[in-house]
Amino acid sequence: MMKKNGAGTDSPLLSVKNLTVSFSRYDHGFNKYDLEVIHSLDVEVYPGEVVAVVGASGSGKSLLAHSVLGILPENATVKGEMAYMGQPLTCELQRKLRGRDMVLIPKSVEFLDTLMKVGRQVKGVRGTMEKVKSVFGRYGLPEEAEKMYPFQLSGGMARRVLISTAVMEAAKLIIADEPTPGLGADMAMETLSHFRELADDGCGVLLITHDIDLAFGIADRIAVFYGGTTVEVCPAGDFKKGKEALRH
């Protein structure tokens, strides 16, 4: 696999090898069985790069994010190897890093607390309002947005608020799970450009999306998922060269 990154390091920030995820289920006769939804999945993210994970709905993209962060439901079983900066990504390490070094930007703005003003949400426990003002300014959010509730934000503003939470935490790994639903083409591209900026600042970005055309605009590498596994991982430019540059 190509070691493409913007920080000049040969070590991946995130490494996922041979990941398998299954869920315990019960049939109509109450017999327990395991439903495997991800198998033999591989992906790496280096500092300073955007890796776009593309695939149709049901291909396992969001489950990859939840596996890395350790937020799968209790009936899930995870096998394989996951590492963060060379350390095995154990449950204990996931809890330590989640929301700090590793941040999820969810697909739905409903993750914002509807009863709390957004400035306070972005500030979190360790931040300051001065830093909130600075981050909001970076993403073109008006000062009055601090005092707004989520329902008062436009779709584009809400997306920028979610991105602001990652910047406030100075996260090293940002996992963006379908961050552009419901946005027009221009607003979607603007939203994704913020992830490109974060990668250029040294973050590793795992961008989960179904829109490969948008991914081309910012990604260093594309990982194609199909049927719960990785079928292709290559530089974004290889897709434009034609099928002779691809394995599949």
What does each model-found stretch correspond to?
Residues 88-103, 239-242:
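ABC ATPase NBD coupling module
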Residues 108, 114-127:
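Q-loop/switch helix immediately C-terminal to the Walker
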Residues 149-153, 157:
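Conserved ABC ATPase signature
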Residues 209-210:
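H-loop/switch region of ABC-family ATPase nucleotide-binding domains
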Residues 77-88:
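Conserved ABC transporter NBD signature motif
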Residues 215-217:
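A short, surface-exposed alpha-helical micro-motif characterized by mixed small hydrophobic
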